[in-house]
Amino acid sequence: ANEQDHCAAPRGDNASLEATFVKRCCHCCLLGRAAQAQGQSCEYNLMVGYQCGQVFRACCVKSQETGDLDVRSLQETDKITEVEEEQEDPYLNDRCRGGGPCKQQCRDTGDEVVCSCFVGYQLLSDGVSCEDVNECITGSHSCRLGESCINTVGSFRCQRDSSCGTGYELTEDNSCKDIDQCESGIHNCLPDFICQNTLGSFRCRPKLQCKNGFIQDALANCIDINECLSIVSAPCPTGHTCINTEGSYTQKNVPNCGRGYHLNEEGTRCDVNECAPPAEPCGKGHRCVNSPGSFRCECKTGYYFDGISRMCVDVNECQRYPGRLCGHKCENTLGSYVCSCSVGFRLSVDGRSCEDINECSSSPCSQECANVYGSYQCYCRRGYQLSDVDGVTCEDIDECALPTGGHICSYRCINIPGSFQCSCPASGYRLAPNGRNCQDIDECVTGIHNCSINETCFNIQGGFRCLAFECPENYRRSAATRCERLPCHENRECSKLPLRITYYHLSFPTNIQAPAVVFRMGPSSAVPGDSMQLAITGGNEEGFFTTRKVSPHSGVVALTKPVPEPRDLLLTVKMDLYRHGTVSSFVAKLFIFVSAEL
């Protein structure tokens, strides 16, 4: 599809499923190229299935890079036959269909769905979502020295810190490329000149070359060279005077100066050079200039002549030209000045400008460093904090010692470098999926208890109990936890026994709020005129519990004070029910298991 802009139909009447799949993949590719050609986003969701969506995006992105698709060729995508539309989607049961649970990329391995992210993103801890990778902080960018890294969503870009300067242009790869003014026609050479490109500039070379003894000026005119003014190579020998002519020069003998005189530079007359060493007629700060028959004193560069004191005084360039000589700081010196920079900057090669120092290149921070203009900033990873002492060292945060540390873990918090861990008691509990709470292990459900076949397993917080009971004499078992009294047959002692004994199991932690109702007792069906009395007849030696009536025919057992430590209690509660002039007794055996609080 990328090369031919159309899809070939499967050949033969018995075209294989593979050929049919290839053609369907081809149509998905053409849809991606069509989206790019029509200016649509390559991330557009067509609800065509995960595999087709991946091919759609890949061909759309590639078409953006090549830009060679003719929209008219996309008409072929409309020619999918009804037979193809009726074929069963081979990826109907694909859990990645439509993207599945993943935010970006999804792959169904058969055993599980694996999510992944596009380049420039990283998978979050939920295993589904993706977040942008900050390549500028992680150091995974490719920016060169002199370039700043700027993070973008899914990628980054490099930006040159300084401009290229006159005569250069910035390329797409942040390089400085010389501008050929001659080729681009932006030079200012006159018609009599030929433009010749140089690095960062150009020069105009005259088309007409001058003869020996002449030099061309800026307008390509030939100007006579005064050979006699050459200081490097004097054309005439000592004792002769040089006389310039058009295109050349001549020489003649010089006069013979008397004692105490010297021939001047022109060789025309004799003069005394009062400025010649070791004589210093002008004094400190002056420059002596010889003249015919005399001399004059001038101030050196960096000094000016004070008409009042008649002396050369130092020029304070920093005050005379404020902010124009130096980029940061200007310090005056005798006859000159010196530029310096603020902290975090260094002096450029021109001796005047200041450029930022990248302090991060020397790794001053213990973890992360970010260079800023004129300084730098240290950062710490999650679980660490910057030291208040030096501002560069990252110290571990003891999450367990924070004011909220007691609420981080339900049982015990253990600090580790950069994070913390929660733990549970050695037995009876396991750590919840959130990594903070402790969940009770129901040994009775999981089958890890050691109760015998004649015992009943009862789960409590952090453990379990094996319970078994037998009905006392003159009673028979009527339910799993209930005993009924046998007929008494005129036996008075027997008639005083409770009609029913029922066993109950209760469990609560030591930190339960008191007072608290833990058990309610009354007849299963009340009759008008019923009344009752409730009393604890055993197991309350320490006075943790009490009874009270809440209605004429029902009462409750309440906890009056917290049980200070884990323990097992057996409480016997007796209810006397008065009905139609007779009294019937009922007993409740309460197995109470007090567990430790987390």
UniProtKB/Swiss-Prot annotation:
Compartmental location: Secreted, Extracellular space, Extracellular matrix
Cellular component aspect of the GO annotation: extracellular matrix; extracellular region
Residue spans crossing the bilayer: none
InterPro entries: Anaphylatoxin/fibulin, cEGF, ECM_structural_protein, EGF-like_Ca-bd_dom, EGF-like_dom, EGF-type_Asp/Asn_hydroxyl_site, EGF_Ca-bd_CS, Fibulin-1
One of the GO BP terms on file: extracellular matrix organization
Disulfide linkage: A1-C25, C7-C26, C28-C52, C29-C59, C42-C60, C96-C106, C102-C115, C117-C130, C136-C149, C143-C158, C164-C176, C182-C195, C189-C204, C210-C222, C228-C242, C257-C270, C275-C288, C282-C297, C299-C312, C318-C330, C326-C339, C341-C354, C360-C369, C365-C378, C380-C394, C400-C413, C409-C422, C424-C438, C444-C457, C451-C466, C471-C483
Glycosylation sites: N14, N450, N454
Family: Belongs to the fibulin family.
UniProt subunit comment: Homomultimerizes and interacts with various extracellular matrix components. Interacts with FBLN7. Interacts with the mature/soluble form of DTR. Interacts with CCN3.
Task performed by this protein: Incorporated into fibronectin-containing matrix fibers. May play a role in cell adhesion and migration along protein fibers within the extracellular matrix (ECM). Could be important for certain developmental processes and contribute to the supramolecular organization of ECM architecture, in particular to those of basement membranes. May serve to anchor the mature/soluble form of DTR to its fibers as it migrates through the extracellular matrix. The direct physical association with DTR may be useful in such tissue developmental processes as wound healing.
Name of the protein: Fibulin-1
Biological source species: Chlorocebus aethiops
